[in-house]
């Protein structure tokens, strides 16, 4: 196997290796790195794994890495893909998709200062099938296939050493690109998550190429053209025109023309560059394509056609504003007062032309921008130049001359950038200008002048005319660039070359007596006047700058050497074809004008060009009509946009498989074959096809799995494996989880394992352990599966059971039960435990992967509620510090302490009012809204630093205070006697208050039952009939998608801009209980106060405050009478006129929400307002879930680091581990490894710990994280402690090292140490390694006693074994010496165990034996435990099946399953109930076959909250909602028996399987019945169908997913001997 295919020197190399086991490794050897990294792609979930451990996934060479992967044998390699670069990776459902570049073209080989720009010549998608059976729709599979068909080759480029997303030379390093031009940002995230961001290149779309030019065979200069396409408005010709909600324009390209003179190594390089833009007109417009030969009809938006135009020019102004960068002294440039942006509009402006409307609006947009006052230092100027009309009337040459005339003034004013690259930074003292030094280059850049401003060209599509005009504009600049570099293009001078001078002057012929020479050091030219015997750097006769702008076409042609012009024209021709192909699917038209300077422009060529243009026109029309929508989808998916629409079930972050080695079984798994191993092959992916045969006498099989890392367990993945008879598979499974083996809790009981084909993957969702009390009070145990489907929670889960979340789970016990009473051996297949592991590596180092976890660690745990970031406990309160732009009045502040304020400390009323309003008044400025994502340009996570004084931490709040406040809310709505039935909106607002108070559903039900109220009576899901609820749910779902799209657009729009101002009205604007309109200036009066008896009016922060103008009815409305911004989105698709009729949502991609647009509640239909409140409640439910995740994450950190977490965490930007700790570790380890570091190692059992001690996990945390004064100690009452340490992996252990506590040891607390080793939890099988008395170490090493001296290496005691022992568990027993056992107890009075003031765990001294004044008992203590040795490479024993076992598995089944014919089947209740009617003489039914469902679980179920900082960054989300509360389905089977009564005979908890998988469920016993009923129960509402392209918001279809329909999905069967039933019956096997 040749690692390096023929044809290459040492360069970046990537090899994608697929082994016969199905495992995929990516071996990457970067040019910038001396070593090789191996990235493992998990074959189950597709997640990337990399630890950076030498010898495991970091090697010296590519060959060494491959030898390790293949065990030195190439026979196990299934396939290999050789590549030159990694372009991206994504896990898309059942596939991992790796994009690599297999062939590169060095399009710009050597930029000034180094760096090669590569164009992707050939690319390949490596499609990796995954074992995870996540349900995936057919549409998703189709979209994934379309993604792989995206045209990448020849149209994308990158540089792996320099930032080229900004004008040359960039001031930023490679890994800080400009996001506007990065096209694979989403695809690069997985590599950033594993700490290898540089392994995925930064990919740009567009064109990059260079041309050398010279004369007489000599190289004079190099011109390079780079065109960067913006991703702010990606898409195809008729789907991405004009401006969008991201303030980006369609087909927007930044072009850069770079010219330099190549020099020898060590010499400075002079260069200059010119930037221009091209793109469609930045207003809201489009074109409707007719299916005829006529032109498309152009239209401009009726409302706000210039919205976003100002932001577009702001982005340009910010990028090209270089007024303050030019050197203030010694340069020719004057100080610039403003930034010019010149728009050259090439559209047809003649009367009657279709493009005339665009010209008019373009001119009007200029007036709009100037009147806005938002660009005070920018001058936007429009030049209208009808290109086609000029060519038709005047011809091509005069058209070019006219363009030059218009461009002369702006081109000269904007100028170009000039500078030098200095190979040595020692020469910077001679630099006169801006100095750019970055780590990516060795030398430095010195820029003498900067281009200030930009010229922007456009036509209708920014294609053909734009390319031609930009060429002729760029040509004039190119000539001037050459002049300033000393390259003469004048024909009368020949093709001479004169060196650059400091003044940038052009070089003409030298006068008599003058001579030019080159400086030997810098390479610069200087001039000698032999007449006066003087020298100068400046040319004695500088030429006139920009002189060709005044020339006529023929004069230009005669006076200019045309070969460089031809080279430049060739670059523009290629560029034009690339951009035209990306935008229209065809090459550029009307390109023949670019060859006007050549001699081949005759009549025949003009005729050929006309034929070519006609052909391209027909190609464009076909592709735009038939292919554009597919290409648009491809681009969006490639960019990671609208994934909730195209790939709705794809998770943000795949789960980890934590059971795989180094996970292992704590007990050997019993097996019928004596030659088999201990069961480790059941956890190894290398034996995916294993069939494990358990002993025949086993009633149950119980497996104890120790996970490779602590995690929260989410799923159990079982691979069904059996012989010829599938009856050997287990029928049910129980799962228990816990941190230690003694505290396991039941999470799943009796989950069904159906019979299915060999090799089928079944997924069992695992919730956290649920309290039996919570299950009882919510009715989940008694009522969940008995309730009617009509009362299913369609809107949201009203009775959500909250399982415990624990990120330190380490032990999983899986118990399998056989089927039936007949004892036959069970067969097991591979077992995998999937979960979410906290990014410990990112926490322990300075990497970004710590993400949200590091934020939680540094955030004080002030409140368990996720809604504590606003001072009135309202996370959704809109910002009141801003004023409306329409009609507004000053905000009057109310009394911040109203008389009826509730006492949050006691939960009691602070006034005499018996039923006060549960509303805490807040007078605060904005910025505390957790859900104001539509009000900010960049949404940032809000910490709890704004928690007000009135809020109380959850753990300090009286137990019933939240329930008391909740009941007060209920009484304020239903009256003191609870006589009033709550309406839908009231019930929803009550739920909002419940979630604000951070009360769980179980706590709510417990409070309601305490006053005799059935929780079901206030369930909003049953407030309306099912038909209306279904419609409401559909609209809320559409709103969620539009809200997600709006957030996406908001984040993208913030690229290149400052933060935008907030909106006063938020996305929902839900009025709280007791709030309402008090009249005043409000003319709408939609939310009139209906204050119940006994409550005061709470009108708000703005009863006389801001007033807004409704854009529909044009009435003034107060804040309470305005609908949320989400209503604006829905109003465009679901108006009041269509509330009872049509109404569809053809494109759920969000149009922008204007900050100056408002809509009152009277102009919205009631169902739209109700959809807003439904979405609001869903968001709050999600926030509660994320709050629980945060609390669980914080608890895990406390358990590992203790209460003073921030002292233990690595500081961002500082190297970790520090050098001192690293040197100490290397010193005591030598050539051995540390085998017991958390999180890979942990404790098997709990270790007794004192209350003021560091956590016992701190004994194993990485050494560099150990606080200098913190240490672990046992309770004083414990005279011995046993710690069982499970090592990182199977290892050869040679010693145990005990780091001494800062207080040191004395004879009183120096323990005796006993150490055992074993490979499982069987204590009888462990081996004693030795017994040591620490007192003897103290006597021989006195430095072990007394306080630790600062600045010294940590004190330690090494317990060395006589011989290394291979084991997985080390048992350590520490025992205090018995009192009186030693007569030589002499305690140093200066020793104080806890006398260090810095110790966060010991505020007071505690032992007289160490110098304290109070006599206390000694205790066991230690600083850290290190287990040293060498890891044993995982060599899973291959289970060799004996001949008898193989014969047993191959035996044919005695009974087969046969189909029971039916009279009829009747679907009912939205197809969630299916009744099967059997024929009178049917055989006894033994079970049923269920074909797995096709419905999906969407990731987006509500509008996003503001804690989503970056939709591409999974580190901002620790755990998705779908795993916090997993959706579980059940199927209930009932039969009709005597007295015509349906009797339930069985209920099955369904696993997840791929669509269409045949699942066979046996009944508990065979049944004889005329009718069998099947009912689907559980979290039915969590599943949906794939979104359609057009969503009918008012349809009366079933509110449940059609993919869950039981119709034609269930078959009954019976068992029979195939030889007894006959040949014909055998054909009916099921």
From Swiss-Prot:
Gene3D superfamilies: 2.20.70.10. InterPro entries: SAC_dom (IPR002013), WW_dom (IPR001202), WW_dom_sf (IPR036020). The gene is SAC9. Keywords: Hydrolase. Disruption phenotype: Characteristics of a constitutive stress response, including dwarfism, closed stomata, and accumulation of anthocyanin and reactive-oxygen species. Accumulates elevated levels of PtdIns(4,5)P(2) and Ins(1,4,5)P(3) in roots. Hypersensitivity to salt stress. Late flowering, shorter roots with less lateral branching and low fertility. Abnormalities of cell wall and membrane structures in primary root cells. A motif (Phosphatase catalytic core) lies at residues 456-467. Residues 508-542 form the WW domain. GO terms for molecular function: phosphatase activity. This is Probable phosphoinositide phosphatase SAC9. It holds the Pfam family SAC9_GBDL_1st. The phosphatase catalytic core motif (or RXNCXDCLDRTN motif) from the SAC domain is found in metal-independent protein phosphatases and inositol polyphosphate phosphatases. Ubiquitous. Most abundant in the roots with lower expression levels throughout the leaves and shoot. Residues 147-527 form the SAC domain. The keyword DNA-binding does not apply. SMART domains: WW.
